[in-house]
């Protein structure tokens, strides 16, 4: 009987103490036999600690499957914002540079230096009617621009941007990153062919077929132009290729791989311009011959998606050129991210200069250059590089 009375008194005392405890500690009391000290705090192994109140460390959150996907979604959102911003100002930079090349002012009315011109154009296109021609395959007609813009952005998941302190600016560091970029980028040909076929327009169809022939013709030369780089570095990981430039030979500074594979660089630049359907290789959308090519029947946001995919692809091949031939984010004392941006901007200017300088090639000249010019030269470059590596390495 005495034991029961003492237990009842203990329970009533614990209940009174529980009402005066802070909520985190009070919530931890699960059994009436928990012991308290004179200050009303839990005593023994059940005591509330600072680690319990602050929660698990970040590493445990990332290791958790849900936390891992949260980090991935946040990273992809930030990357999407950065690439969209870069694309918008690439269009502005191109229009200003072409204006200077052609001795005209370019966009200078909306905002300071015309910086808000792209926002005005985007709002205008967003409110335009998205006209769908009659007798079209509506599913494919809508799917085609979605494939184009999705493939363009997906390639950036494996492209490293650089370092900033201890932070590493890339999402996925895979050991076959360059192959993944090529595989995703090759989906662009399906988007163009499907868009041309589903539009029920002869000019759109001809533009789509031209694009398919052009991309297939130059993809092989583009891939073979990079094989000597892979042979020298011994890796397909983009980060390894960028870091190789600071560890090559007896040098301590960045040694760009263009000095080792200059022919591969020239082939890459020409093939990359053709792969992105840019002037002077913009045959799929030749206005004088095909009105607008595969874009003839597209308007509104669907046209914007194709337009956006073209410029994202242009930034992608410029970033790859900086990584594969010019040391990526290594540029002496310049911070890595800024060094990478400087190199990408220089390649973008090269694209714009080519558009403002050279006329469009004829279709037969384009095919002859791809099959009889670049492809044999790329194969010979691979063979010569292999012979030199065997001779040097023994």
Per-segment meaning from a language model:
Residues 52-394:
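Selective transmembrane helix interface/packing segments
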Residues 1, 5-22, 26-29, 35, ...:
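Cationic, amphipathic, low-complexity alpha-helical segments enriched
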Residues 40-42, 46-57:
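Short, Lys/Arg-enriched N-terminal segments with co-localized hydrophobic residues
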């Amino acid at each position: 009987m005495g034991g029961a009375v003492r237990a009842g008194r203990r329970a009533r005392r614990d209940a009174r103490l529980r009402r005066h405890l802070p909520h985190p500690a009070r919530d931890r009391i699960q059994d009436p036999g928990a012991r308290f000290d004179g200050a009303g705090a839990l005593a023994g192994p059940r005591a509330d600690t600072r680690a319990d109140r602050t929660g698990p460390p970040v590493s445990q959150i990332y290791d958790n499957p849900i936390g891992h996907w949260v980090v991935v979604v946040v990273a992809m959102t930030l990357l999407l914002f950065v690439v969209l911003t870069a694309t918008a100002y690439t269009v502005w930079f191109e229009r200003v540079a072409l204006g200077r090349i052609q001795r005209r002012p370019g966009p200078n009315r909306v905002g300071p230096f015309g910086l808000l011109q792209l926002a005005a154009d985007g709002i205008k296109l967003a409110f335009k009617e998205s006209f769908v021609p009659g007798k079209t395959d509506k599913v494919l007609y809508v799917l085609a621009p979605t494939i184009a813009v999705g493939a363009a952005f997906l390639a950036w998941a494996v492209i490293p941007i650089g370092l900033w302190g201890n932070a590493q600016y890339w999402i996925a560091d895979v050991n076959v990153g360059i192959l993944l970029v090529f595989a995703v980028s090759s989906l662009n040909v399906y988007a163009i062919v499907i868009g041309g076929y589903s539009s029920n327009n002869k000019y759109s169809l001809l533009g789509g077929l031209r694009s398919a022939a052009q991309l297939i013709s130059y993809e092989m030369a583009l891939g073979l132009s990079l094989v000597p780089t892979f042979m020298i570095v011994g890796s397909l990981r983009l980060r390894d290729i960028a870091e190789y430039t600071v560890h090559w030979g007896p040098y301590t500074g960045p040694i760009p791989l263009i000095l080792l594979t200059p022919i591969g660089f020239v082939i890459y630049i020409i093939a990359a311009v053709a792969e992105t359907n840019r002037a002077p290789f913009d045959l799929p959308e030749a206005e004088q011959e095909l009105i607008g090519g595969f874009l003839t029947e597209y308007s509104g946001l669907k046209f914007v998606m194709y337009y956006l995919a073209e410029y994202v692809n242009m930034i992608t091949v410029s970033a790859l050129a900086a990584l594969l031939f010019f040391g990526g984010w290594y540029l002496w004392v310049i911070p890595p991210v800024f060094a990478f941006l400087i190199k990408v901007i220089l390649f973008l200017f090269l694209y714009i200069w080519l558009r403002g300088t050279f006329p469009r090639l004829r279709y037969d000249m384009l095919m002859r250059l791809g099959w009889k010019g670049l492809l044999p030269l790329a194969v010979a470059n691979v063979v010569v590089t292999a012979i030199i590596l065997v001779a040097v390495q023994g």
